[in-house]
Amino acid sequence: RKYTYILLLLFLAVSTNAQKSAWDEIKEDVCIAGGGYCSYPYPRHEVPKLTPAPKGYKPFYMSHYGRHGSRWLHDPAQYSNPIQVLEKADKYGKLTARGKEVLKQLREIEVSSKGRIGELTTVGARQHQEIAQRMTKNFPEIFRGKNVIVDTKSSTVMRCALSMLNEVKELEAFNPRMTVNADASGADMWYMVYGDSKAAQLEKEARAKELKAFDEKHFHPDYFVSKMFNDRQFAQDSLDLHGIMRAILDITSNQQSHDTEISFWDLFDEQERYENWLIDNAFWYVVRGPSPITEGYMPHLAENLLNNILESADKAIAGKGVNANLRFGHDACLVPLVCLMELGDFGKVFNDLEDLAASRWHIHDLTTMGANMQLIFYRSKKSDDILVKALLNEKELSMPVPSETAPYYSWKALRAYYKSKLEASKK
């Protein structure tokens, strides 16, 4: 009985940890409150352990799509606008001592941002170097040997190209004999970076209605106001509280993209931090996920990319391709791809945005800065069946076909599933 009780406690502990809420995750790691601005989870967290492949199977090919690493904010107004609002409050003597300090720090940050808007940071470069190092450590068979060829393609945006080059540098250090074909050309953007007029219109309508309503419902700035302003009535009557709070939250969230000690998380209590994540999570689900609000349309933006992944894998399996196809782009491309491929719970449909938080559709698990999806292909000398494993941010995820060897899946079954899905979409 004693041993049974101990085992039960261990089971409950594991289950509780596996089902940890976003609220609890944010309490333990405030970076997660940044949502899509969250930096890559390692080395803050322990890198997940990988399940050994079935006996006799060895990795031979990798197919990948990754988001650029941590960056500066992509609009100068994200730095200047909150300064202007705080200067107005300061002019009337309405800032607290902490508010005055924040204004000073924001001015310093804005000066540092000059000429670097949207660019990769030192943190972002380091993320990709370490990702590549773990690729070669986890799957040396793919990258070892004198005839290894790696094809890398990037969005034409500089931060993506530099993310690619930081990984390439580490791959070449692991195997100086490998051939790396690196390219960032408009010729590949038809499948690497995507969007269309329908998606833009659906997003515009959702922002104006459902997302706006969700944001307003979860906007409770009391603690923030008390930290920043000495006159609550002035702040409510004379300032755009929603705008200033959201602007400072953006900067706060993105400070983890820099090697800096400056932090503004103390301006927000636990509820405000959580609601920032909640709003961002809902935003991404609607504008790039399978949300009914946007007609379930957004994942289909990734169809050309998925087709490229299938075709590239066919070539590699037939011995006519390369050892690895690495693609570097953006969060707005990675999110639809993961949803289209139905990895983990990211293909699930939720009719009520309030249900998202209790699910496992969490944006910080999907697209942090430096986020990436890796498909690892395995073969055995004793079987013709190719197996594949999906890693999202180096964590094993389920795939949408049955398997007795999960997280390893039959590529034949997966390929047929995805081909059928792409064909059905054409009708």
Where are these regions (language model features)?
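Signature for phosphate-centric chemistry
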Residues: 19-151, 155-325, 329-427
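Bacterial Sec-dependent N-terminal signal peptides
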Residues: 1-22
